[in-house]
Amino acid sequence: MKYKYLPNNIKKIHHYFFTLPPDDKYIRYTMEKAMYLVDETGLAQYNTLKERGFYSNILGTSAVFSIFCDSIRFDKSTMEFTYYGRQRIERRSNILMRELVTAGQLRRVPRTENNPHGLLIVNWRTLLNKDIEQKTKSNY
């Protein structure tokens, strides 16, 4: 297996889940794409956020969420990873930076058009998601 694709798959699922503009069609599109790359643990996270009104809140407040990968720790023998990143949440009056750490494992699956590298993220979970900095935006 070529391990050079692994960080891209891990980054891609995080991009789909955590880069969210206030656009319901785009959010549905990215979540649909994400579900091809993650097992039921990803669907459970999505459903929990949806039930809590997370996506409706993004639309209602015109918040823009962006994710930035700091690093990925990967163990080739177990195919386990830990993702370290930051999320930027821009709202009308402030910008919030959050620290995000997730973990999971990659499992080989048949390649498909929707999963061209044939890697499924399993047992995906959020280990840390905390505020690290908040800035008030200047109104001119």
Whereabouts are the PLM-identified features?
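Structured, amphipathic secondary-structure segments that form assembly/contact surfaces
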Residues: 1-4, 8, 18, 22-140
